[in-house]
Amino acid sequence: MATKQEEQANLSDVLTPSMSLTELEMKFADETDGKAKDVVQARIKKAEDGILPLRLQFNDFTQIMSSLDEERYANVSKQEKFQMIRSKVLGLTERLQELSNDFEELQPLFATVGEYSKTYKNKNFQVLENLASYNHRGKAGASISNSTPTPAAATPTTAPTPGAGTKKAAKTAPTPTATATIGTPSNNAPTPATTATTPGTQAKKPRKPRQTKKQQQAAAAAAAVAQAQAQAQAQAQNQNQNNMQNKNISNPGMNSNMGTPVMGNPNMKQMQSPIPANAMNNMNVPHNGAMRPSVPNGNMGNPSMGNLNMNAPNMGNPNMNNPNMNNPNAMMSPMAGQGQLNQMFPMQNHNQNGQFMGQQSPGPNIGQMQFPPNNGNMNGMPGTSDMNLGMNPSMNMNMGMNLNQITPANILSMNTKGKDDQMQNIGMDQNQNQNQSQNQSQNQNQSMNMNMNNDSNNPKSAYDLVDFNSLDLSSLNMDFL
């Protein structure tokens, strides 16, 4: 034990903390104290010899830990296993601690290796790891590690040739410090990898508008298709409406909302006078031109009540003795003035002379109602409750005929014109009735048969639009004679 303590004392005197290379050389060169070199060599030999037993002891410990479940340890109790493992661990830690103490005592010598390589330009000795962190002395170890430069670990270990090798070593000598400072945490310079990747990520952003263009094109195509479909639907709806209107015009008996056709003027095909639906549905005028009110006494009510029964207690005989009633041309003209009926369904009552019995109230001014020359008779129909106006084109209720346009030639052509239009409309009625549903076709066939029977019974009243025997030409413009 004394010898071991003496060796430690001698080694501590030789290898002092923060010792420089020159001081170590001076101690080794002192002839008076020639034991210093021998003491350092003996301690290095001891540390080197302690490495192999430590490795063998560690291998034994790992083998025992891996074979605890084998059959050879089946009869061993758990307590014995615990004690065996504990002894192996303690022996391993003791051997490791001895090796650590030997390296710690030699730490001042290892610190001079880097300085030796720089001074003598010899790289035969390069420390792979600095053991200053394992120094339990604290400040001394820290001062040693800070004072000595850290050698580069990537430098080759081959010995250079004398002569030219020294020049190459002089040129490459600063490389260890340069390589050491590049990887230190104190260097805050950004690495080139981060600067290189940033433009790469930003260069990918312009690709997004390409996708948006495709999406915009797809959306525009979809919008165009939708717009074309909407236009096609609108055109189909308009065509259907036009077809329905054409059917209604060609067959006025099918639509209760159609106006009264005008057949007196050769220059005008037909004029429509809008009449409320409830009034048109409840009115019917046969080919003989007589209006048939639903009330037996021939009274006519207010159309605002939804019914065309017009209650006129002072009318008495339905024959109306208005001077203009005997003149069908005056009734046909919208310019007849005082002799025309300005409102079809007035709100007040009439007497037999066509005079108003009360104050005129605002009512629906539907149009000028024109009666055919049938002596103004209004035949009562007690079996019905409403007035029904038939929408056959042959009915004698013509609207708005101007007397100034009537000439002898027009008077002669009115009869033939009415016959041609009547036959054309009857043919169109028959074609339209075939395209309707079964229930509507049956009803219209019945109405057509009734109209044809009336025409056959009284052909003169059906086709002769003007009765020359009852014409009053006193109000005609005779300038053309």
Swiss-Prot record:
GO molecular function: transcription coregulator activity
Protein name, UniProt field: Mediator of RNA polymerase II transcription subunit 3
Disordered, as annotated region: 140-261, 415-463
Protein's GO biological process: regulation of transcription by RNA polymerase II
Manganese listed as a keyword: no
Composition skew (Basic residues), residue ranges: 204-213
Organism: Candida glabrata (strain ATCC 2001 / BCRC 20586 / JCM 3761 / NBRC 0622 / NRRL Y-65 / CBS 138)
Keywords, in A-Z order: Activator, Coiled coil, Nucleus, Transcription, Transcription regulation
The organism's place on the tree of life at top rank: Eukaryota
Disulfide bonds: none
Any Pfam family hit: Med3
Coiled-coil zones: 79-107
GO CC annotations on file: mediator complex
Localization (cell): Nucleus
Subunit structure: Component of the Mediator complex.
Biased composition (Polar residues): 249-259
